[in-house]
């Protein structure tokens, strides 16, 4: 009995955790930021805002935010699809566990409590799958409307490009910080705003200090974003190594299965483990691609500052 319970825990423990709607949160955040920018603009005195400032605030900053938000939503959509694929593999395994537990219970080798536990795990994962599918459909509709389609359109959504490791070689926070500072929308706006202040006034001096602090924040943020890229690269390499090891285990399981030296559940467990490692590689690739895009967007000026 205890062996069966332990086996079930091992099998269930290999299933993926419930995913988050990361891309939806990103998109909502970008949309709220866009609306906030409009409110801030309305609160300013229009007589003190130059056409260049208005263009930066209304056009440049919001365009970049929406483009970056659409990219993040696309990446998040692909992540949801990967999570669905992982759940499908997990459901296949859990269904087999449930059927096996029922059979063992019929032969007096498992308790009704164990049967109930297996069924609850299966039903819980099925419910998660339904929620995930609903989130995927909602996010697809969001993507369609963001990109100019009707919400119920069915355009082909292709894969996100694979992360190009060569891009990392071209990243250098020390060299890129000048461009990031010069391009930053907040800094550009405030630099132009200096023209509206009386040189030597308290407001002028305060704004000068603010701009200096903002430039320092850009520099430190760029270093953090670069470090995140490196971390995501390491995580991807680790995931790839784990996947290669799991493929070797799968080959061994294949031979044992053909020889009849392992049971069906053990074989399915190895299949699910391989699928989990495969999806971890794809997830790591998406995460690295997102990290590189975030760094590049910061260099282009799309970096929110705390000032």
Segments from the language model and where they lie:
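Short, solvent-exposed, mixed-charge loop/turn linkers that connect secondary-structure elements
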Residues: 133-175, 292-307
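Charged, solvent-exposed structural "stalk/scaffold" segments
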Residues: 44, 69, 76-131, 234-282, ...
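Short flexible linkers and secondary-structure junctions
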Residues: 1-72
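Sec/SRP-type N-terminal targeting helices
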Residues: 33-58, 113, 117, 186-244, ...
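Long, non-membrane, amphipathic alpha-helices that form coiled-coils
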Residues: 52-55, 59-62, 80, 84-87, ...
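Polar, low-complexity export/assembly segments characteristic of proteins
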Residues: 177-181
């Amino acid at each position: 009995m205890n062996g069966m319970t332990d086996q079930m825990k091992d099998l269930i423990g290999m299933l993926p955790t419930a995913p988050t709607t990361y891309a939806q949160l990103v998109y909502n955040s970008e949309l709220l930021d866009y609306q906030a920018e409009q409110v801030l603009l309305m609160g300013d005195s229009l007589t003190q805002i130059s056409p260049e400032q208005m263009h930066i605030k209304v056009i440049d900053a919001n365009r970049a935010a929406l483009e970056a938000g659409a990219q993040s939503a696309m990446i998040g959509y692909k992540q949801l699809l990967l999570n669905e694929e992982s759940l499908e593999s997990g459901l296949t395994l859990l269904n087999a566990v449930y059927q096996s537990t029922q059979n063992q219970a019929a032969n007096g080798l498992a308790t009704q409590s164990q049967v109930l536990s297996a069924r609850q795990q299966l039903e819980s994962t099925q419910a998660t799958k339904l929620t995930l599918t609903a989130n995927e459909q909602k996010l697809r509709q969001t993507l369609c409307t963001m990109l100019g389609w009707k919400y119920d359109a069915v355009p082909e959504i292709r894969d996100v490009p694979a992360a190009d490791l060569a891009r990392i070689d071209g990243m250098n926070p020390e060299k890129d910080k000048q461009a990031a500072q010069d391009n930053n929308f907040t800094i550009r706006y405030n630099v132009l705003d200096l023209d509206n202040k009386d040189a030597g006034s308290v407001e002028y001096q305060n704004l000068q200090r603010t701009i200096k602090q903002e430039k320092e924040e850009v520099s430190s943020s760029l270093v953090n974003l670069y470090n995140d890229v490196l971390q995501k690269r390491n995580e991807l390499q680790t995931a790839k190594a784990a996947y290669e090891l799991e493929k070797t285990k799968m080959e061994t399981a294949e031979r044992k299965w053909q020889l009849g030296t392992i049971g069906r559940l053990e074989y399915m467990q190895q299949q699910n483990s391989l699928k989990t490692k495969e999806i971890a590689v794809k997830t790591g690739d998406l995460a690295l691609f997102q990290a590189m895009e975030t760094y590049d967007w910061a260099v282009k000026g799309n970096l929110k500052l705390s000032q």
